[in-house]
Amino acid sequence: MKTILLFLGVCAVGASMMTGGWTNKDVNDEEVKKLAIFASTKFNEKSNSLVFEKMCKILEAKSQLVAGMLYDITFEASPTVCKKNDKNYVPIYQCPLLPCAPRKI
């Protein structure tokens, strides 16, 4: 199993928020979804897998206010049938999962 964690610094932070520990975020929050998709895309760019991996479900999301904002997002991902070297580009959201493929965290 893999743990895919996303740590992103976001510069624009309101001064009214206190810095410190991790705060749980709603996994259905639109910002969390966008950041998880971004992390999944970066993972696919850097992995040596022959096929794309697709995010299936966000399991947990947390944020921490420091000099910017850090995010820790854990999600399940599974391999798809879409090959990275295929000349007929298919957007990742249209790629079906491999049958009986194990989900990775």
From Swiss-Prot:
Family of this protein: Belongs to the cystatin family.
Organism whose genome encodes this protein: Hadronyche infensa (Fraser island funnel-web spider)
SMART domains: CY (SM00043)
Record keywords: Disulfide bond, Ion channel impairing toxin, Protease inhibitor, Secreted, Signal, Thiol protease inhibitor, Toxin
Cell compartment(s), UniProt: Secreted
Major location (coarse): secreted
Posttranslational modification: Contains 2 disulfide bonds.
Function statement: Inhibits various C1 cysteine proteases. This protein has no toxic activity and its function in the venom is unknown. It may play a role as a housekeeping or regulatory protein.
UniProt protein name: U7-hexatoxin-Hi1a
